[in-house]
Regions:
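Short, intrinsically disordered, mixed-charge
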Residues: 30-33, 69-73, 124
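Secondary-structure boundary/capping residues
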Residues: 37, 73-77, 112
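A generic structural signal for short beta-strands and their flanking turns/coil linkers
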Residues: 9-11, 16, 24, 34, ...
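Catalytic strand-loop segment that frames the active site of acyl-thioester-processing enzymes
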Residues: 1-55, 140
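Hydrophobic beta-strand-centered segment that forms part of the acyl-chain substrate-binding groove
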Residues: 46-55, 61-104
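Residues within alpha-helical segments
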Residues: 11, 30, 58, 65, ...
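HotDog/MaoC-like acyl-thioester-processing domains
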Residues: 1-9, 91-149
Length: 149
């Protein structure tokens, strides 16, 4: 297991921004089977109190994937073990979002070591639309030592 030296509490990683399109909604719907009309039917969305069809919450959550960060290519031995998300504001087709992950803490439980990353998705108006967390277990290196850096 190896982590970059800068991978300490407070370290921030951002993934490239993406502008959401109808294709994102369609692909996500096809992949997951989530075809709820709130995501594609304008009239249904308006009746439900939204301006227009909403992005799938789990589409937004999936965009916080650690593997999408440049830092992930320098980090080895992390196993994804937990996550949570809160959806703060709606997202729509045409919104440009950028995921941000922040190392919140690194701790040990017995012989196992963990990292908790705070997750956020921010829109083009710099509004946080999603907050959450990921927890990763750090696997031991081949010498059974846990290295940091």
């Amino acid at each position: 297991m190896s982590l970059p030296a800068a991978f300490v509490p407070g370290f921030v990683m951002e993934s490239p921004s993406k502008t959401l399109t109808d294709a994102h909604f369609l692909f996500f719907s096809g992949l997951t089977g989530d075809v709820h009309p709130i995501h594609y039917d304008c009239e249904y969305a308006k009746r439900a109190g939204a301006d227009r069809p909403l992005a799938h919450g789990m589409l937004l959550a999936s965009m916080t994937a650690f593997g999408a960060t440049a830092v992930s290519q320098q980090t080895h031995g992390l196993v994804f073990v937990d996550q949570g998300s809160r959806f703060i504001k709606p997202c729509y087709v045409g919104d440009t979002i950028r995921p941000r992950l922040t190392v919140e803490r690194i701790w040990q439980e017995g012989k196992r070591k963990f990292v908790r990353l705070g997750t956020e998705v921010i829109n083009q108006r710099d509004e946080v639309v999603l907050t959450g967390f990921h927890v990763y277990q750090l696997q031991k290196s081949s010498t059974n030592e846990v290295h940091h850096g």
